[in-house]
C-alpha cells in the first residue's frame, strides 16, 4: 500500500551490492573486513572489529560490476570528513574524476554511528580518503537503482563473444533505464532523441515493458518548442 498518494512513484528498485575486492589501502586498520561485509545497521556497541581509515589514509573498493546508483556508508563511533571519488575504472577513481552531469569527486562529513548515502551516477570503484580525523567504517556498500523488468528477448549463438556482447548490451541499456531512458548512465544522463533510436531498438528486443520509450519521447516533445529542433539538433525531428 502506498502511503504518499500525491507523490510521484519511483518505478525503480534498489539492491545493496557488497564490496567484492579491496584493491588498495594505505594507513588503514582491518580494511579487508569490508570485502563481502553484510552489515547494514550502525550500533552503539559491538563486539565485532571495524575498519578504520587513519587520518591521511585511504582505500579503494571494487564492487565487481558497474552499476547506476550510490554508495552507502555505515559508520562507527569515530567519523569525520572524507573525500569520495567514483570511477568506472581504477585510474579514474584514483585520479580526479570530472563533474560532468553528476558529482564524482566530493568531500563529505560522515555522521557518528549513523548512515550516509551519496551519489547518482554509474560507477564500479570508489576511493575513500580520511581528511581530518580517523574514520570508523562498519560497512560500505553500493546502492544499485534499476527497473526490475523481465527480460523476454533472447540471443544465443555458437560464438561466446557474441553472446557476451548481447548480455553486455542488455545490461547497459538497463542501466540507462532510470526515470527516463538516458543517453548514458554516467553522462550525459539526459534524454536525447538521437540516442533513443538505438536504445529503443534494444528495449523492444529485450524487455516486456517498453513504456519508458514513449514516456521519454513525450518528455522530449513537451520540452521542445514548436518552432525549434528537438534537443537543438536539426536532424532529430526527422
Annotate the PLM regions.
Residues 186-190:
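Conserved short loop/turn motifs at secondary-structure junctions
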Residues 191-192, 238:
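Secondary-structure capping and boundary motifs in well-ordered enzyme cores
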Residues 1-183, 194-195, 208-220, 226-235:
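Extracellular/oxidizing-compartment recognition motifs
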Amino acid at each position: 500500500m502506498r502511503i504518499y498518494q500525491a507523490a510521484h512513484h519511483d518505478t525503480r528498485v534498489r539492491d545493496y551490492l557488497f564490496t567484492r575486492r579491496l584493491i588498495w589501502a594505505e594507513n588503514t586498520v582491518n580494511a579487508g573486513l569490508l570485502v563481502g561485509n553484510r552489515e547494514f545497521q550502525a550500533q552503539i556497541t559491538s563486539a565485532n572489529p571495524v575498519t578504520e581509515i587513519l587520518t591521511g589514509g585511504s582505500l579503494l573498493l571494487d564492487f565487481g560490476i558497474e552499476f547506476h546508483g550510490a554508495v552507502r556508508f555505515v559508520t562507527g563511533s569515530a567519523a569525520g570528513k572524507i573525500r569520495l571519488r567514483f570511477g568506472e575504472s581504477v585510474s579514474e577513481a584514483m585520479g580526479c574524476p570530472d563533474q560532468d552531469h553528476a558529482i564524482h569527486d566530493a568531500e563529505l562529513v560522515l555522521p557518528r554511528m549513523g548512515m550516509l548515502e551519496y551519489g547518482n551516477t554509474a560507477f564500479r570503484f570508489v576511493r575513500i580518503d580520511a581528511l581530518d580525523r580517523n574514520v570508523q567504517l562498519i560497512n560500505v556498500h553500493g546502492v544499485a537503482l534499476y527497473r526490475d523488468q523481465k527480460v523476454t528477448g533472447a540471443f544465443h549463438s555458437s560464438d561466446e563473444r557474441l553472446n557476451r556482447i548481447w548480455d553486455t548490451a542488455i545490461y547497459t541499456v538497463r542501466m540507462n533505464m532510470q526515470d527516463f531512458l538516458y543517453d548514458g548512465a554516467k553522462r550525459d544522463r539526459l534524454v536525447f532523441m538521437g540516442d533513443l533510436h538505438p536504445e529503443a531498438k534494444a528495449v523492444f528486443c529485450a524487455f516486456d515493458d517498453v513504456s519508458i520509450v514513449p514516456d521519454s519521447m513525450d518528455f522530449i516533445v513537451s520540452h521542445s518548442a514548436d518552432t525549434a529542433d528537438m534537443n537543438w539538433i536539426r536532424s532529430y525531428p526527422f
